[in-house]
């Protein structure tokens, strides 16, 4: 069995483009920041990828270190939010509250751990303005026509995180460059806001923050100038994370900002990029309306976080069948809580969160548990809990998604038929239930049922 304290976690660092041992700045308090949602619509399966990556990382870190401070922001001021509220004829605050609550409900349904701190951008405007003021003062930002822009040429390592050359980025740009920019690569820290849109008074006039400064200000507010891990989807690597790193390191030159960068791969649907026009675009809620949560969770765990994950309904059904077998093993082996984690599972997760290998390590335990090995069943339970699985009892799992009252009524009818020696009717009821995937088990205490 594994001793979590003796394991060494090796994580791929996007910045160094290599897998390396994770060494926290303070082993007594590991500090982690993940970019959260922009709350203008229901979260979709692609959004879920980063949240699952963060969840497994946080679960693992909490088995290895005494304290983990996990911060995940909510972006509640954004042009997409403004446009959607106008399209809906809805108040902006009503839209952001509704979609934030829906986001929380979706993640809770999937047993994803909440962050310790969940700052909202609109609650940290003063923190953003303080950073912007420092950047203007030290020459890394400038004011132009009511905008404040970051001067990328003044930060020599700009592009280092994403592996891009600034000159190549500018040469490849096809968008029209705003005339007030000194350099085409300069990005907005603050911009003017129209009277009918959210805005705050500032030394630069009434306006609102740019996207990138929001995360820099909130991570600094709760985690300081240096923290351990910054994560998110690889679609955020450039420009968002590149710009975060630049403005934070220029604002606080004695800090390291994030010492380790973790990025997850993207999601396909039936082998193609999700698109409403292709009919393969699904929100989390749409999937959970058709399936229990744990199969979706297992499907995500079945792909390494840095690889591309391909969603399909067939794969979701296969994940459900796998869970049927694992839950059956827990039941047969009479799994008990409190067992140490299996070494094979810890070793897999400590190797860059290798969840496919961790899932593979569950199957030998399930094989033994199916033969009545209680130790194996208990180890299986402990491993599954670390992975965020086995959130219900086997009895609850096998009775989910069926009409329990209708089954109980048929069992009572069968009992009455047997008492009246109408064995043909009793056998017909058993056969009817078996055809629906329900197995009856007669014992001294009466008849119980389970999904086959």
UniProtKB/Swiss-Prot annotation:
Any one Pfam family match given in the protein's UniProt record, by short name: CysS_C
Cofactor annotation remark: Binds 1 zinc ion per subunit.
Motif ('KMSKS' region): 273-277
Location in the cell: Cytoplasm
Cross-referenced InterPro entries: Cys-tRNA-ligase, Cys-tRNA-synt_Ia_DALR, Cys-tRNA/MSH_ligase, CysS_C, Rossmann-like_a/b/a_fold, tRNA-synt_1_cat_dom, tRNAsynth_Ia_anticodon-bd
Residues the entry annotates as binding Zn(2+): 35, 215, 240, 244
Motif ('HIGH' region): 37-47
Keyword annotations: Aminoacyl-tRNA synthetase, ATP-binding, Cytoplasm, Ligase, Metal-binding, Nucleotide-binding, Protein biosynthesis, Zinc
Description of how the protein assembles with itself and partners: Monomer.
Protein name, per record: Cysteine--tRNA ligase
Source organism of the structure: Gluconobacter oxydans (strain 621H)
Name of the gene this protein is made from: cysS
């Amino acid at each position: 069995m594994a001793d979590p304290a003796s394991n060494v976690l090796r994580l791929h660092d996007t910045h160094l483009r290599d897998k390396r041992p994770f060494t926290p700045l303070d082993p007594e308090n590991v500090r982690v920041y993940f970019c959260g949602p922009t709350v203008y619509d229901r979260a979709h399966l692609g959004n879920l990828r980063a949240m699952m990556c963060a969840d497994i990382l946080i679960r693992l870190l909490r088995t290895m270190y005494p304290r983990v401070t996990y911060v995940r922001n909510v972006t509640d001021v954004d042009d997409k939010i403004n446009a959607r509220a106008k399209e809906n004829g809805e108040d902006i605050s009503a839209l952001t509250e509704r979609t934030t609550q829906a986001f929380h409900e979706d993640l809770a349904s999937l047993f994803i751990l909440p962050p310790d701190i969940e700052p909202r951008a609109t609650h940290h405007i003063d923190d953003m303005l303080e950073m912007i003021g420092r950047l203007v003062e030290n020459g890394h930002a400038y004011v132009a026509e009511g905008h404040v822009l970051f001067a990328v040429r003044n930060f020599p390592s700009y592009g280092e995180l994403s592996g891009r050359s600034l000159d190549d980025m500018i040469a490849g740009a096809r968008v029209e460059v705003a005339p007030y920019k000194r350099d085409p690569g300069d990005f907005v820290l603050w911009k003017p806001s129209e009277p009918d849109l959210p805005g705050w008074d500032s030394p630069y006039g009434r306006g609102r923050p740019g996207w990138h400064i929001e995360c820099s200000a909130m991570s600094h507010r709760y985690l300081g100038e240096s923290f351990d891990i910054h994560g998110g989807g690889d679609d955020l690597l450039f420009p968002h994370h590149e710009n975060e790193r630049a403005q934070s390191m220029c604002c606080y030159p004695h800090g390291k900002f994030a010492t380790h960068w973790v990025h997850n791969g993207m999601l396909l649907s039936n082998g193609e990029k999700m698109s409403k026009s292709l009919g393969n675009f699904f929100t989390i809620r749409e999937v959970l309306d058709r399936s229990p949560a744990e199969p979706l969770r297992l499907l995500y765990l079945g792909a390494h976080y840095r690889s591309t994950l391909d969603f399909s309904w067939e794969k979701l059904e296969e994940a459900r069948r796998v869970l049927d077998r694992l839950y059956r093993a827990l039941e047969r082996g009479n799994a008990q809580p409190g067992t140490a984690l299996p070494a094979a599972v810890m070793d897999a997760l400590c190797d860059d969160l290798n969840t496919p290998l961790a899932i593979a390590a569950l199957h030998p335990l399930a094989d033994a548990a199916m033969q009545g090995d209680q130790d194996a069943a208990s180890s299986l339970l402990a491993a599954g809990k670390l992975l965020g699985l086995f959130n219900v009892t086997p009895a609850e799992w096998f009775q989910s998604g069926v009409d329990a009252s209708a089954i109980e009524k048929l069992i009572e009818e069968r009992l009455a038929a047997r008492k009246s020696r109408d064995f043909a009717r009793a056998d017909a009821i058993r056969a009817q239930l078996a055809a629906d995937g329900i197995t009856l088990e007669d014992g001294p205490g009466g008849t119980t049922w389970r999904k086959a």
